[in-house]
């Protein structure tokens, strides 16, 4: 109940919460709390595609992204959140992965993430 209004707006959230109305996957996608709609037979393949896309990123970058996103979810002050220090971001900046990304890009090859 606390997060839904932030994701889809107070009007839509209250409409759903006060009436108990269920929404279809398509409506959930239009409202912005569903990422993708697939046929049931394609569900596993779609989930694997999402996992494959995430897997291609640096593990340290994923960790830092999640930390910043979760820690700032309820922070209304953008300037404050931009100035905050995040341990995972600091670790990323000093890592081999931080160097590997631009090098791989410059060499036109896929990066070899080490997670360190």
Spans of model-derived segments:
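Terminal peptide-recognition signature
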Residues: 4, 28, 65, 105
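A general structural signal for well-ordered alpha-helical segments in protein cores
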Residues: 1, 10-13, 51, 61-66, ...
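Helix-loop "lid/cap" segments that line or gate small-molecule binding pockets
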Residues: 16-17, 68, 72, 87-93
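C-terminal long alpha-helix characteristic of the crotonase
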Residues: 25, 34-83, 112-116
